[in-house]
């Protein structure tokens, strides 16, 4: 009888875990569920004017790139990855210029644009990926965009903007660990975080304005798109909540027991600036090291 009860409990736990992996899933046993990003409604009136691999939104074309510097030595040879960890911020900006004339690291002018970048990029991520934007500390001790546009909007992680110390740049999609017993998660936020631009390599988002479109028109055209309808919904942008990446396919309690300290194999991991785990790319549990 005891064995039957044990099997029944295991089956119920497995069913709950499977349900938690589905969008909108989750429950009292295994909290979590899918990302909170909503569905995409196609707009048949859209016409694309951007270069290949670039995505148009409003008056801008965007490119999400790993910064791995993919290149082909010869036609008969495979593609070579020069840098799998991304690029420093200044190099990332130069890379954008190589991808398209007049392109630079993205300039974020509004909350609506920030929300679009967040939803668009996170949908393509398999694992958390910090991304450079174009904001960086200028020589006069002020934040400035690589595009040369004025800084009219910011979305820093803290209430006040950090000091524009030399060597700092802004990144987006920082990852924080949400430790849970059954289902560890990584939270990706749409806020900006200062980072050492010459010490840290990240992916990047490039931006350019197609011919005939200027940055001055960004506020008027860089709004979310909606399918045709009699009355459009309110256009007021709302701040996006964090997306939760569900990572652990197994039960941590069963896979990490038997250690010296209270029967656990977990131990502390050195963390980088802002308490992000130094090995979250390599460690399958993102927050613990067996």
From Swiss-Prot:
Q: Where on this protein are sugars attached?
A: 102
Stretches assigned to the C-type lectin domain: 92-162
What keywords would UniProt list here? Glycoprotein, Signal
Q: Which residues form the signal peptide?
A: 1-20
Q: Does the keyword Signal apply?
A: yes
Q: Which GO terms fall under molecular function for this chain's record?
A: carbohydrate binding; pattern recognition receptor activity
Please indicate which superkingdom the organism of origin belongs to. Eukaryota
Indicate what this protein is called per its UniProt record: 30 kDa spicule matrix protein alpha
Organism from which the protein derives: Strongylocentrotus purpuratus (Purple sea urchin)
Taxonomic lineage is: Eukaryota, Metazoa, Echinodermata, Eleutherozoa, Echinozoa
